Amino acid sequence: MYFQLVKLNRYYLGLGSNEDARLTHIQTAIFELNEQQINVLSCSALYENEAQGFSGKAFYNACIAIDTALSSRELLQRCLSLELSHGRARTHAPATYQDRPLDIDLLLGPDSMNDSDLTLPHPRMAQRRFVLEPLREVAAALKDLQNLDEIELLLSQCRDDSTLSPVNIRLLCSYTDLWKNSEMVVIEGCIGVGKTSLCNQLAARYSIDTHLERFESNPYLSHFYQDPEAYALPTELHFLADRQQALHELNEKKGIVADYHISKSALFAQLNLNPQDLALFNRFYSWSKKLTKAPGLYVLLDAPVEQLEKRIKQRARSYESQIDSAYLERIRSAYLKGHTSEEAQLVIDTTHLDFVNEQADFDRICDQINHLLLAQRLTNHNLA
């Protein structure tokens, strides 16, 4: 078997936006580039500056470095298509500037070019401090000394004295970086809905850690399904203690996807305990909740009971063999009613989704979660 080595070319791109959600356009474009046969290596700081060459709104600008096997023309077409998907309509009129949601320019490439469609290096970058400053940052971060020397020379000769104001947020290179810099994402839902499967898939795609429920460590669980009245309290207290201890150890960690949170204990206690036992349980739960950090994002999976029963039967866990449809319906209803107040909640109806076996279904779920994670990051930086 022979493997053909693919030559990767290094490019530097400039990104700008002065319309709508400027940061969202730029950050999303970087993520999208990274998933199109392109590896985003480094991002500069984000800067705000006044529009140049026309009277318009202030711009956000940044530069990135990428490696790709695409040719310069192929890369240009990717960038133009991405601009179009963000609502940019380029004009063919010479030297015409206007407000735009997304602007992507090829600044430097492996070879010089000069034709009607593309010129490298970019013919006007030497006149623009908002290009040269972030470009220098990226070249320095990659220790690209040859380009760095040329950029430093251009900066020393640049007559552009406009002010660049740093924006207080770090641009990320990929969705993997977004997950690694996000607070814990919790995937919950009824028994058999696919929480653990989705957690494992997300962890594999974004190279993050999982934190999964340890059902087998609860010695009362199998007895509970045989005699719920006798074993409900010890079962729920054991789960509460186990969850609180495990989650408390993760309070300061990021980049984790979990298939439960401490609120799961309250939900099942409400379902399974009599009033007297529930009062005792709530005393321990109140203390445990204070010691546990809220999740960054709470995702609730839902499915009809018929599907849940089918999945439970397929995985054939002995301690789940006694679960009946009425109990599943109570749990499902409790989740749908009880978590409407969770912050940053996303409810996903999996009735017609097979995210384990269908890539498109899994991609759709990832898109929904990624959208919320990015929105949450911008909100936390007061930049939404």
Q: What is each residue range found by the language model?
A:
Residues 195:
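Conserved lysine of the Walker
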Residues 204-245, 265:
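Conserved substrate/cofactor phosphate-moiety recognition/catalytic segment
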Residues 198, 202:
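Hydrophobic positions on the alpha1 helix immediately C-terminal to the Walker A/P-loop
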Residues 53-58, 76, 81-180:
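Flexible, gly/pro- and Lys/Arg-enriched active-site loops
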Residues 25-72:
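Short, surface-exposed acidic-centric catalytic microdomains
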Residues 266-336:
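A glycine- and Lys/Arg-enriched "phosphate-lid" helix/loop adjacent to the NTP-binding pocket
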